[in-house]
Curated annotation (Swiss-Prot):
Belongs to the PAPS reductase family. CysD subfamily. This is Sulfate adenylyltransferase subunit 2. The gene is cysD. Its EC number is 2.7.7.4. With CysN forms the ATP sulfurylase (ATPS) that catalyzes the adenylation of sulfate producing adenosine 5'-phosphosulfate (APS) and diphosphate, the first enzymatic step in sulfur assimilation pathway. APS synthesis involves the formation of a high-energy phosphoric-sulfuric acid anhydride bond driven by GTP hydrolysis by CysN coupled to ATP hydrolysis by CysD. It comes from the Bacteria.
Length: 302
């Protein structure tokens, strides 16, 4: 079928599948990052399609901070069991030994040690030369200027001023020993594209994306869900049952919920058509300091 005969979502799907297949053929030891969110779920679905009826020929890696929502971990394990993909889970052992907590140590230190350093540990441990990520250019300004094939040096750092040209969808995956490429097959998708594709393909998601009554407290202008008994409450502070959902998912102490009645995919898509705010406004790690996401990416974050 000619490209002009494909629908918008079909064109995005075809581009992403081409990228996934090209990486699988070009690199010796690729891995797909699996953060359990909606973008990861779409990327997993595309990988399954890319190699159907065979199995995905590379593992999925979850860098677990030990502070994810309980529903996310349960969903992760259910997906691995249902689809039979190889799942690698890595936790930063030094961070666990130090007892790193977003409450005691703050979002910046927690993210650096448990996410960035944990990711670099896992990539070094398994010797991966390419790693798929679910980032999209419409999410955030530093991601908007990143290539589909994002070169990382032997320290896993990113230099936005030294990126490779990608003319006519031609990608340069040449790396020396110790270097790697971060690959973003969803680069050209928007948040609305993601939701419409989830609806079209009937992709399973963590229930946290759908509105229901949940126990939350207000912190720094954000509604934080009390997911377990590790969350310290201020004197007199009591969680309230509010009808909320999550537009983006991460560590529960650093992820804000939003008031919503969208408990179906159709209602979420309708909500997305009307929204004028960024999905990442609910992520505390993006507001640590000016240009905080670009700084994290320079240091090795996805």
């Amino acid at each position: 079928m000619a490209a002009k005969e494909l629908s918008h979502l079909q064109q995005l799907e075809a581009e992403s599948i081409q990228i996934i297949r090209e990486v699988a053929a070009e690199f010796d030891n690729p891995v797909m990052m699996y953060s359990i969110g909606k973008d990861s779920s779409v990327m997993l679905h595309l990988a399954r399609k890319a190699f159907y009826p065979g199995k995905i020929p590379f593992p999925l890696l979850h860098v677990d901070t030990d502070w994810k929502f309980k529903e996310m971990i349960a969903f992760r394990d259910e997906q691995a069991k249902e689809f039979g993909f190889e799942l690698l889970v890595h936790k930063n052992p030094e961070g666990l030994e130090m007892g790193i907590s977003p409450f005691e140590h703050g979002s910046a230190k927690h993210t650096d040690i448990m996410k960035t350093q944990g990711l670099k540990q896992a990539l070094n441990k398994y010797g991966f030369d390419a790693a798929f990520g679910g980032a999209r250019r419409d999410e955030e300004k530093s991601r908007a200027k990143e290539r589909v094939y994002s070169f990382r040096d032997k320290h896993h750092t990113w230099d936005p001023k030294n990126q490779r040209p990608e003319l006519w969808r031609t990608y340069n995956g040449a790396v020396n020993k110790g270097e790697s490429i971060r690959v973003f097959p969803l680069s050209n998708w928007t948040e609305l594209d993601i939701w419409q594709y989830i609806y079209q393909e009937n992709i399973q998601l963590v229930p946290l994306y759908f509105a229901q009554k949940r126990p939350v407290v207000e912190r720094d202008g954000m509604m934080i869900m009390v997911d377990d008994d590790r969350m310290p409450l201020a004197e007199g502070e009591q969680p309230k049952q509010e009808l909320v959902r999550f537009r983006t998912l991460g560590c529960y102490p650093l992820t804000g919920a939003m008031h919503s009645e969208a408990d179906t995919l159709e209602k979420i898509i309708e909500e997305m058509l009307l929204t004028r705010s960024s999905e990442r406004q609910g992520r505390l790690i993006d507001s640590d300091q000016s240009a905080s996401m670009e700084l994290k990416k320079r240091q090795g974050y996805f």
